[in-house]
């Protein structure tokens, strides 16, 4: 059974929001569903162009694939960056000669006094070690060497990945479209939560208007305006999230 991992790695609860904006994502629930449908048959996982994303969601996907008893084979055909590079370590793998891996340190946003900053720093260091463990388990390199790669925000070619032991072999594949790597998720947390509330409000308002004018036989002015307002709000949120 084939699974494609692409776009951004996001939480299950956030995927609906990204879908709403038409942004490609992969969430743990997609992988769990595919594993259930495979029912013990081998999985052919293709990482096409995946920019990484949420650390914990990436860990869930990695663990689900690594623990699957039916067999997993992973092909990197475009870009496996950040959290996606961790997922690429979940089983026997191969990499297109034109593909790339990218590994780097975990990042986050924190606020507070110096105690909070110290805690945030320590948490990030522990998260880095957890991610490095995937590279260590795959390649046999030391944790120190794995963290050194992450320190430099390293871009790794297929040949170098094989040399490092991160990839088992180089495969033949079509040349992927050249892209610029994106850092961080394209939708800030505040935009996700605001959109979630707006969708819920829009659904409730739509039901209220539909019930009130059920016998009208055609859309009312209020219904048309409500749909326009909802569309404008969606476009405004998308503009702010992508261009700030």
Residue ranges and their predicted role:
Residues 1-83, 90-99, 107-244:
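N-terminal organellar transit peptides
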């Amino acid at each position: 059974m084939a699974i494609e991992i692409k776009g951004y790695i996001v939480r299950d609860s956030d995927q609906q929001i990204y879908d709403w904006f038409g942004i490609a994502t992969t969430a743990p629930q997609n992988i769990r569903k595919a594993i259930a449908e495979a029912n013990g048959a081998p999985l052919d996982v293709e990482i096409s162009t995946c920019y990484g994303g949420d650390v914990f969601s990436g860990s869930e996907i990695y663990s689900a694939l690594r623990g699957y008893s039916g067999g997993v084979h992973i092909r990197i055909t475009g870009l496996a960056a950040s959290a996606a590079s961790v997922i690429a370590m979940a089983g026997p793998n191969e990499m297109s000669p034109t593909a790339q891996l990218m590994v780097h340190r975990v990042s986050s946003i924190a606020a507070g006094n110096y105690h909070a900053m110290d805690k945030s720093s320590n948490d990030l260091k522990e998260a880095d070690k957890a991610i490095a463990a995937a590279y260590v388990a795959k390649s046999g390199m030391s944790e120190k060497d794995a963290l050194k790669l992450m320190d430099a925000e390293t871009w790794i070619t297929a040949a170098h990945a094989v040399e490092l032991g991160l990839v088992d072999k180089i495969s033949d594949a079509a040349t992927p479209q050249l892209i610029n790597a994106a850092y961080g998720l394209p939708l800030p947390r505040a935009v996700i939560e605001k959109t979630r509330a707006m969708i819920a409000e829009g659904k409730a308002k739509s039901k209220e208007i539909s019930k009130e004018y059920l016998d009208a036989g055609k859309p009312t002015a209020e219904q048309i305006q409500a749909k326009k307002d909802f569309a404008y709000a969606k476009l405004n949120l998308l503009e702010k999230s992508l261009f700030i």
